[in-house]
Amino acid sequence: MKHIILCIHFLLMVVGLGQAQDCSVAPNMRVNCGYPTVTEADCRAVGCCFDSSILNTKWCFYNATAGPIKKLECSGDPTKRIDCGFPRITEKQCILRGCCFDSSISGVKWCYARTVITTPAPDTTTASTTAETTTVPTTPETTTVPTTPETTTVPTTPETTTVPTTPETTTVPTTPETTTVPTTPETTTVPTTPETTTVPTTPETTTVPTTPETTTVPTTPETTTVPTTPETTTASTTAETTTVPTTPETTTEPTTTPTTDTTPPTLPPTPETTTETTTETTTETTTETTTETTTETTTAPPPECAADRVDCGYSGITQADCEGKGCIFDSTIPETKWCFYTEAEAPARKAECTVDPSVRTDCGYPGITDKECREKGCCYDECIPDVIWCFEKAVPVVNS
């Protein structure tokens, strides 16, 4: 029995050393398992390895067994990728959905579904058979006395202990079949997000109704000054109340209208027709003037100028954060920049970030996001692969 116990301890030590060395992956062979700024606790919680001792490498990565399989799941023809995200999705959001993220190739989907790999299954069975053959010859021939070799109790225990442990742990690659996420992109069809965030109606509602209502209130004292003719027609009194306040606000030309209203008080039908026309014209003029004033201050440029927008925010920025930086927010035009600088400030901002990609000065760290880079006051451009995306702004040259 002592020999059997020693054999079991020896096997457990071998398995433990194998698992401890499972994370010994060369830095250039590591397969990313996390997202930018992932913590060690979050990385190990999903069963991945974490090593931050080597700079400019992947800190959260798959172990030596799962790494090659995960790499195959995210490889393949970029033109045949199946979308797994939504416009402007971040790398963290994509990986948390169980999808692959690769922004090194432009013009293709960056967040896409994994490919199901079914080849690793036979490899696990061969590994388990070798483990059985190596463990059996250790004890029975050297330690058993001729009285008890016929019982052959030794080979039974290693077979029961070694067979279920190793293949079950190594057959984990079957789980990607459960996490093939082509169903989630169908449910989260992205056109919902721009519709919910399109709030171009708010500036119109806040500015228009306040001013005209306050100006029309003083019309009531005019009705009290003309108590002599209300018995003839009530419509004439309403005509006076509507025409008087509108003329001083819009223009001084409509001063001729009160003379025409006062001269024919004896004809009741005519003021009814005139009041209807005047009320329509006054409401049109007031709304036109108010909308003109608001569009000059807050509205975005027309669609034909959308290509000239200079980005002022980051992926997923909200309207409140964008306007808090003093920039303009307009989400009505898809496939354009929604948060951008004003027309006066755009040329200077564009010149600051117009730097030759080969001479860019690094301003961030590996895996930095668009938001984190811009919050540091740096430029961010991920359109060109294999260059620095977060870089220092160019110093403008002042002409003396």
Curated annotation (Swiss-Prot):
Expressed and stored exclusively in mature mucous glands of the skin. Extensively O-glycosylated. Consist of about 70% carbohydrate and 30% protein. Sequence repeats lie at residues 127-135, 136-144, 145-153, 154-162, 163-171, 172-180, 181-189, 190-198, 199-207, 208-216, 217-225, 226-234, 235-243, 244-252, 253-261, 272-275, 276-279, 280-283, 284-287, 288-291, 292-295, 296-299. InterPro entries: P_trefoil_chordata (IPR017994), P_trefoil_CS (IPR017957), P_trefoil_dom (IPR000519), P_trefoil_dom_sf (IPR044913). Residues 127-261 are annotated as: 15 X 9 AA approximate tandem repeats of [AV]-[SP]-T-T-[AP]-E-T-T-T. It comes from the Eukaryota. SUPFAM superfamilies: Trefoil. GO terms for biological process: maintenance of gastrointestinal epithelium. Glycans are attached at N63. Disulfide bonds join C23-C49, C33-C48, C43-C60, C74-C100, C84-C99, C94-C111, C312-C327, C322-C339, C353-C379, C363-C378, C373-C390. PROSITE patterns: P_TREFOIL_1, P_TREFOIL_2. Residues 1-20 form the signal peptide. Keywords: Disulfide bond, Glycoprotein, Repeat, Secreted, Signal. Residues 272-299 are annotated as: 7 X 4 AA repeats of E-T-T-T. Its main location: secreted. Residues 122-264, 272-299 have a biased composition (Low complexity). It is found in: Secreted. Pfam families: Trefoil. GO terms for cellular component: extracellular space. Residues 122-302 are annotated as: Disordered. Residues 21-64, 72-115, 298-343, 351-394 form the P-type domain. Could be involved in defense against microbial infections. Protects the epithelia from external environment. This is Integumentary mucin A.1. It comes from Xenopus laevis (African clawed frog).
